[in-house]
Amino acid sequence: MFAVHLVAFYFTKLKEDQIKKVDRFLYHMRLSDETLVDIMARFQAEMEKGLGKDTNPTASVKMLPTFVRAIPDGSENGEFLSLDLGGSKFRVLKVQVSQEGQQNVQMESQFYPMPNEITRGNGTELFDYVADCLADFMKTKNLTHKKLPLGFTFSFPCRQNKLEEGVLLSWTKKFKARGVQDTDVVNRLATAMKKHKDLDVDILALVNDTVGTMMTCAYDDPNCEVGVIIGTGTNACYMEDMSNIDLVEGDEGRMCINTEWGAFGDDGALEDIRTEFDRELDLGSLNPGKQLFEKMISGLYMGELVRLILLKMAKVGLLFGGAKSSALHTKGKIETQHVAAMEMSKEGLANTREILVDLGLEPSESDCIAVQHVCTIVSFRSANLCAAALATILTRLRENKKLARLRTTVGMDGTLYKTHPQYPKRLHKVVRRLVPNCDVRFLLSESGSTKGAAMVTAVASRVQAQRKQIDKVLALFQLTREQLLGVRDKMRAELEYGLKKKTHSLATVKMLPTYVYGMPDGTEKGKFLALDLGGTNFRVLLVKIRRRSVRMYNKIFAIPLEIMQGTGEELFDHIVQCIADFLDYMGLKGAQLPLGFTFSFPCRQTCIDKGTLVGWTKGFKATDCEGEDVVDMLREAIKRRNEFDLDIVAIVNDTVGTMMTCGYEDPRCEIGLIAGTGSNVCYMEEMRNIELVDGDEGRMCVNTEWGGFGDNGCIDDIRTQYDKEVDEGSLNAGKQRYEKMTSGMYLGEIVRRILIDLTRQGLLFRGQISERLRTRGIFETKFLSQIESDRLALLQVRRILQQLGLDSTCEDSIVVKEVCGAVSRRAAQMCGAGMAAIVEKRREDQGLQHFKVTVGVDGTLYKLHPHFSRILQETVKELAPQCDVTFMLSEDGSGKGAALITAVAKRLQQPRKDI
């Protein structure tokens, strides 16, 4: 028993001694965590350099855009061919992707040899050989009668400008075919395939093997957004935000970047890490000074590194008693498969002895232990370096997504990773140690990168087909110049109908006289109350007017839905309650003040303090109001309360209030526009044109109520099925059709209807219509403004959609943003066409060649939407080129305008209370 313990002790001591000896000799190959963190920082800097337009030419890590913008979503379908060129064998594959209720992939493949005379010969011969193999495969599988899309996995660095193109930057591994560098390899393959008349193949995608690996794994796990190869060579790809890729135009979405990390260090960034053995190996390689990171990691070089170390250790007498065999002197005699065999847990030492004996050496027990440890240090360093670079990519993904913790999947492939017994667990352990805030799943690509090329092709086919369907829907909202001119001219005709006595009753644009005859002259003064009713909020203001200065105090009150859609008496009692609260709040209880009432609904007026409601809009439905004088209803509610008395001087529309507010600042202002919850315009019209009011002298403000434009069907040619659905689901079906295409209250609902349709077609949200998406009104217009903001990254768009209960992918977010853009752009253009009709009419009425005018504008859509105001202004400029139109934002809203109109009325003190 004692003897057994003695032998065990001796062996353990021997092992420890040998390990220490090797550790001392290979001290520089053992990398601490501190060193790995430093390497991460260097790799991050190189990635940034590669992504920058100005710095890319000198970057060693090329960060090549692949033009792969989407990963599989499970809806891919069809038959695809795939070629895989990049290793010692060449593979042709047929992939059948079908849904049938579940994801299903069937593959048939054939391997063909890649002789050295082909890989290092003439480029034309190389591609002819590939085309011959493809033709043979198609003939064998009876596919020559079919036209099939093809994905080409090409495992060498290429610069791409599109998915189906790739210019070879340089050969790597053992390839050296002449005349291929700086040429488009897809074009070279297509030319070679043309020599086979029976081949009808469409090359849809060129992908790197890492991209293929990522796509293969992403088909099984949608969280996969990184691909890593650790085999003959080494490389990684990952999904990068487009906003960070300077080399490609556009900021939307993500694109897969082929890092080509094998060249990391080619600029000297890793000189302090490289050892004498790395330098010796590099000098004896096919491409000295190139792919230095790869030469410290990949399977092509690992065995050779071990051989060089063993040779040196033998030379200095640390191994084999100083003996060296001719095999140990021979390049390539130790391969990576030998390293893997020597590091096996149980058979490792026996394998080591056998391999060393085959090399003509006579190893002792201690030699075998030492050699095994050399292999461990070399392969562990490889795993450490890979882990540092991968950890950098994972950190970048986490930071791009602005997450405290990232959950992601890395697709893995490569013979070294797959066949080395210790490599995967070492890599995983170090990665998790370097990025503790990332939960990483490592997924082995069972079918290799060739299936991935087919998946890229399948995704490209799907995206192409989906793009056509999406474009078809969006095209409905793209108005041509001719269509916009048509809207302008029809609006002009409707304006005329509304002004004329004979046609007024049939006109959709009501052109209501407001009895506002003039603008402030700056002499107005006093204290005035103003009410502003027109949306879900109601505002009460105290306005103090002094010579050329206005001070305002206001309070906002909510109008609950049950009040908006209850009885008229309840609505006006609620308004009076709000006035009472405000007077109390301002310490004016019992004060008798002149009041201006901004009432943003169509009213027929016979004088300035009388307004008969024509019809509710914007979601209001209070009963017993339509056809009634709303000023009388307000007076009666004040009487019912019996707490205070107010002198109601004027009732004005919000557009009139806006025009007056801006007119106080700019005498040229004679048009008011509201583009908010609702949409409307007023303007100063010549009295001679207003047939509903007696008198031809001077001008009067006309409230167009243009929201009703199109109620007679005159713009049905540009109304879409979605507009019709929104109209049918509204409180006032068949009414306010123009407003329903242009105002904030309805744009979100149009977007929601489009999203439902696209989802139904399987183009969004994985074809799943959530309960939330079925809910009317979830898509408020403020979300459109947020989603379309140029400053907002897609990640933030996704967050907005998630707040709405919509679980969207990056691709979904792009489509949602496009839909929002199409709907709001059309709204702005139609508003612009309507405005062009008004300014052109004013120009012609005054007989002017050139007309200069200011439009006072208010409304949340105009103020908050990032593009609405610009598009509206551009449209007016294009459709009314002889008019110089300035748009002035009404900072203080239409409430101030009501007070100004009241002030003007009091100043003039006309018994009729006309202005």
Swiss-Prot record:
Region called Hexokinase small subdomain 1, residue ranges: 73-207
Ranges in a coiled coil: none
Region feature Mitochondrial-binding peptide (MBP), mapped onto this chain: 1-20
One GO-annotated biological process of the protein: glycolytic process
Knockout mutant characteristics: Embryonic lethality.
Enzyme Commission designation: 2.7.1.1
Pfam families noted in UniProt: Hexokinase_1, Hexokinase_2
Annotated segments matching region Hexokinase large subdomain 1: 208-447
Protein residues bound to ATP 1: R30, D84, L85, G86, G87, S88, K89, K425, R426
Pathway(s): Carbohydrate metabolism; hexose metabolism; Carbohydrate degradation; glycolysis; D-glyceraldehyde 3-phosphate and glycerone phosphate from D-glucose: step 1/4
GO cellular component, one term: photoreceptor inner segment
The reaction(s) this protein catalyses: a D-hexose + ATP = a D-hexose 6-phosphate + ADP + H(+); D-glucose + ATP = D-glucose 6-phosphate + ADP + H(+)
Residues bound to D-glucose 6-phosphate 1: D84, L85, G86, G87, S88, K89, F90, R91, D209, T232, D413, G414, T415, S449
Annotated InterPro entries: ATPase_NBD (IPR043129), Hexokinase (IPR001312), Hexokinase_BS (IPR019807), Hexokinase_C (IPR022673), Hexokinase_N (IPR022672)
Annotated positions binding D-glucose 6-phosphate 2: D532, L533, G534, G535, T536, D654, T677, D858, G859, T860, S894
Binding site for D-glucose 2: S600, F601, T617, K618, N653, D654, S679, N680, E705, E739
GO molecular function, one term: glucokinase activity
Membrane topology category: Peripheral membrane protein
Major localization listed first in the record, in broad terms: cytoplasm
Region (Hexokinase small subdomain 2): 521-652
Cell compartment(s), UniProt: Cytoplasm; Mitochondrion membrane; Photoreceptor inner segment
Residue ranges occupied by any Hexokinase domain in the UniProt entry: 16-458, 464-903
Family that this chain belongs to: Belongs to the hexokinase family.
Record protein name field: Hexokinase HKDC1
Taxonomic source organism: Mus musculus
Source organism phylogeny: Eukaryota, Metazoa, Chordata, Craniata, Vertebrata
